[in-house]
Amino acid sequence: MPRPSWCRWRPYFILHKEGQIIDATVVLDIGKTNAKLTLLDTAGAILAEQRCPNQIIATGLYPHHDTERLWNWLQGTLASFAGLARISAIVPVTHGATAALVDDEGLVLPILDYESTLPQALAAEYEKLRPAFADSLSPQLPCGLNLGLQLYWLAKTYPQQFARARHILTYPQYWAWRLCGVAASEVTSLGCHTDLWQPQQGTFSSLVHRMEWTPLFPPLQAAWTALGPVRGNPALRDCQVLCGIHDSNASLLRYLEADAHEQPRTVLSTGTWAIAAAFGARLDRLDETADMLANVNALGQPVACMRFMGGREFSVLAGASPQVCAVADIARLVEQGTLALPCFAESGGPFVGQAGRIVGPAPQTAQEHYALATLYCALMSDYCLDALGAGGPVTVEGSFTDNPHFASVLAALRPGQDVAVSQDASGTTCGGWMLHRWGEVPVMEATVMAALALDGLAAYRAQWRAHIYPTA
């Protein structure tokens, strides 16, 4: 059967030992923009990978995830992978702010897109119920980025369907449940700006108790827990489904071993969102008005974080047909004072609600647009690191590692810190693999980047910040 045009297949050369079948792990990584299925061997090497866009259905009751399309793609891809290796585990890794309401048969309502605009009147009602920031470390966010608001809206708008729900499943656990039939809850998805969790106490929030949702959440399981075997697929009858994890937290897993989380350092996980997770940063620095929050890592510990929609904003600034720039393009924009001022996405970030704009001479070529996008994302990342009080080395993971200049510009903006680029472009995939091999820490391969020599960069940075805070 030919593969659909929306899927991208990436085969890898596979070495079979004579007389042996390769044992492998599958990581299902569902990001907001794309979904990816990766087959990895026992050493973490990629054997095969397939991707497809993660699309939102705008029709129906409300904008929602096309779960059936993803399910059909997943089943077809698993069948292909089963012919390449013996799959012993499947690990779901997904974006946050998403949950499924299910009964024993399946979804009772479509899974709401967190970028949906919800009624302001209802949001005002919800504001009276949500826990204080000091308890949840979850800021009030636009659209449906607070999962508690999504659930409140669904309960008020579709009470009959909501009443049928047996479980509320955060998104990684929905896919685990769909694969193996075992319902579970897990702290990394409960603890990412949901209003549902108290990170410092490790318990459900007052909102959950007020709404009487506690019985709907299945028992808590560790992200690495094997929930059960895959159902309904004889080729995968010996394959265990793991509980799964929130994608940004998957990128942090390698830093949780051997008490590494106690040493000051920052992981900048990049994709649709750029999320700075600062180990050792103080939680009392978090500003709920600036999209600062505490995510909860796989061990249940709060980690100070700040974020902006870096991948989304980069795409807007770089244009529909991005062309990688040269250092000369970046230097030219710095010299002429071309600035991109936040923000260029409608959801989240410290400057949400402000309209992005360009001041100074406009970029003229595709390469200059790419250069401006790179400068903007580096300046935003630098701003977030300062706000967090992030100390120690910085490691960039995810999609920005493909940008040949981003980390070098960031290093130039932060002369007191090492800025490294992970050689594993997908920290989420590595993190998913680690859950199946818990305790087997892969070698951390990262390249410390030399700061890009740019005349006038310090003045350019000061000018950018002066525009953001004109009275400062």
Predicted regions and their residues:
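N-terminal glycine/serine-rich phosphate-binding loop of ATP-dependent small-molecule kinases
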Residues: 3-111, 120-121, 135, 164, ...
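Short, acidic/turn-prone active-site loops that include or flank metal/cofactor-
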Residues: 52-57, 113-120, 191, 272-274, ...
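Active-site core segments that coordinate phosphate-bearing ligands/cofactors
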Residues: 27, 127-139, 152-165, 170, ...
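A conserved helix-loop-beta module that forms one wall/lid of the active-site cleft
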Residues: 209-225
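Conserved phosphate-binding loops in N-terminal lobes of ATP-dependent enzymes
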Residues: 36, 76-89, 144-153, 158-159, ...
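Short beta-strand-loop/turn "lid" adjacent to the catalytic site in phosphate-handling enzymes
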Residues: 82-115, 139-145, 172, 176-198, ...
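Short alpha-helix plus adjacent loop in nuclease-associated cores
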Residues: 116-131
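Short glycine/serine/threonine-rich phosphate/pyrophosphate-binding segments
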Residues: 94, 148, 251-252
